[in-house]
Amino acid sequence: MSKERFDFIFPLGAGCSCSMMLREKGLQLASFPLDWVGTPDFGAAGDIRAKTDIVVGRFENWFRKENLVRSPVYDTPRHLSYLDRGTGLYFTHDVAAGSSLDADYPAAREKYARRIDRFLQLLSGARRVLAVWVNDPRIPGEVGEEDLRYCLDAFARAYPRAGFKIVAVNCVHGVKPSDMRVAIGEGYECYSFDYRAFTECSDDLVWEIRRDLFAPLLERFEVADYRTRAEKRANARREKARAMEKYRATSALDLWLTRLKFKVYRHLKRSLERKGVVVESCGAGTARG
């Protein structure tokens, strides 16, 4: 069966899992500004509308230092969380724990400038565009037809030469995947079901996303390879480095297991010899007469 092909596919949020799923399926080939940010204070409908407004506004007021305030509610062991009062977004991956905004802001600002430039160039040159939005299970509410029409109209006004489609996925607690609610209209698809995965983290029950449940929703799509030759070469080098690291880790594990087996064998051999059993190199044993 032929797949629906797009020039550009990008994540609208609401959290990190959307970008992670697109990458796993080969539908996102580069990093973009909305990959790891969210607006949980806005609710589901507010999040997708806010992200759309940011895109059509060409990221005006994005990540300005004077708008960033500490908000430790989303701190992690590795990073400090900051609320951007200009956009309502939470930035949770840009200031390292133990560091400061003053120290880490220049590099983060440069990173976002690079990603925004790439994003806007791809969006401006695309004729068929797919935006994917998957709600974070912790964000209340659902995205409905009115919200999707708002986003499609905003995209169409900002980029009249492109045809846009939105795939939105709501997390509705208690609705099994087999009972998924589906709404399909002109330019959008909306799926609603419960995709929470419960995992224990410290003393809290954390809601994660079961990304395996989304495979059928994304396998119908494909994207043109918009990477430059330099980006493809860089990606090939990264893949090779990851493969080598995996190989080294596997080799180290194999070596450790071999040494462990030898130690166990030597210990058993000595133990048997003390009992009068001769252990040959092949592993057979004969009793001394």
Each language-model region and where it sits:
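Adenosine ribonucleotide-centric catalytic and binding domains
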Residues: P11-Y82
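Short, charged beta->alpha transition segments
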Residues: D75-S81, K111-L123
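Surface-exposed cleft-lining segments at the edges of enzyme active sites
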Residues: Y90-E110, W133-V143
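Well-ordered, non-membrane alpha-helical segments in soluble/globular domains
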Residues: Y105-D117, G141-R157, R210-R211
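Short, conserved loop/helix-junction motifs that constitute active-site signature segments
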Residues: L123-S124, F155-A162
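Short beta-alpha junction loops
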Residues: N135-P137, F164-K176
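Extended, charge-rich low-complexity interaction segments
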Residues: G187-E239
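Membrane-proximal basic amphipathic "stem/tether" segments
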Residues: T228-G289
